[in-house]
């Protein structure tokens, strides 16, 4: 018989991973080895990646917002030259798209912040949408060519450009961690005929906050950052399945975004994710015949 944790314990660990707990704190609280927690994260990440990719398609969204959120892996970019770093160490950006009506995360992508990653992100988004949408992004320049490559003229695309002043508190210690003050915005139509009243990135930015609160490795000014790029992606895959399919949203009347978007008929839970893990697990390679024990 396989030596593995029961379903309830595994579901609890997965819930803790998307409720702001670090992996070592989960190990301490549950009394489970850190290696077991790590393996469970890897298995869950792989299962959730396949499930999300196969399920979140044919979307009938009308308004979509996109944004990028910063994190880092192994070391910050400014320390990259001073450390013997593995591949993908340094700044890591997570690109996300969210349906403004159902709050569903349509797709996500992890990598750099340049034109190559913007293009791959937008091509994937276009492949998941079933109709023409109004798309809003921030003023990041790579979006311009990426949207054109992915959608052509079959989209109503606008950018919301924020204007910033100086950080409160000046350049001293008081203003070191304070964001610059937003002094205004400009709405710029790029493709098609976007409705200016609906040009917004508020839901995408609010979802960024949810990510920072839900995943410990996204919390600023801690040592809980990702040490390995693969595990960074695994926890994101788990988080987005939880956010879309398992989490009750008060703004939606207590149902999940997937239910609101019409791609799920019920509210799922982490035991469902455990079931995905077990389904994806390879069958034990037991011998078909056994030698008789010598007398």
Predicted regions and their residues:
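Residue-level recognition of single "structural anchor" positions
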Residues: 1-295
